[in-house]
UniProtKB/Swiss-Prot annotation:
Gene name in the database record: yrkL
Organism: Bacillus subtilis (strain 168)
SUPFAM superfamilies noted in UniProt: Flavoproteins
Family statement: Belongs to the NAD(P)H dehydrogenase (quinone) family.
Gene Ontology molecular function: electron transfer activity; FMN binding; NAD(P)H dehydrogenase (quinone) activity
This enzyme's EC code(s): 1.6.99.-
Source species, domain of life: Bacteria
Cited InterPro entries: Flavodoxin_fold, Flavoprotein-like_sf, KefG/KefF
Protein name: Uncharacterized NAD(P)H oxidoreductase YrkL
Keywords: Oxidoreductase
Amino acid sequence: MKTLVIVIHPNLETSVVNKTWMNRLKQEKDITVHDLYGEYPNFIIDVEKEQQLLLDHERIVFQFPMYWYSSPALLKQWEDDVLTHGWAYGTGGTKLHGKELLLAISLGAQESDYQAGGEYNITISELIRPFQVTANYIGMRFLPAFTQYGTLHLSKEDVKNSAERLVDYLKAEH
């Protein structure tokens, strides 16, 4: 399955986990890696180019670090600009119907922090609900997220293993 991984990290050069994930994914022949901040540092998005990338792939992955319980700002801008009426939704807006969407999220906190009674008293499933609603609205199949918790405390080996698990997850049938 042709997979597009859209990497959304505003400081990718200083990243450990997301940069490792991205570099590992670039080695896969059926995975296209697209660095959104690298491509659009000024937030001026080439809508036609982005829409064509989506059309060329069956599985779309948003890869990002969790920032203030959400995704980095450029992803919201991308959604607003690229997922247009008449293309992604509304009359004639069926271009993404049947495609798959999943999230690959890195989080500094521990998994136990993201649950009822935890530090944040909310689950990741609840935090990513807007992505699920968007996927449903534009006719995409929303898949369970790939999450890596505790990224602030991972060893180099843990990061490498996380990248391998991500590759396996993206290649699996869901």
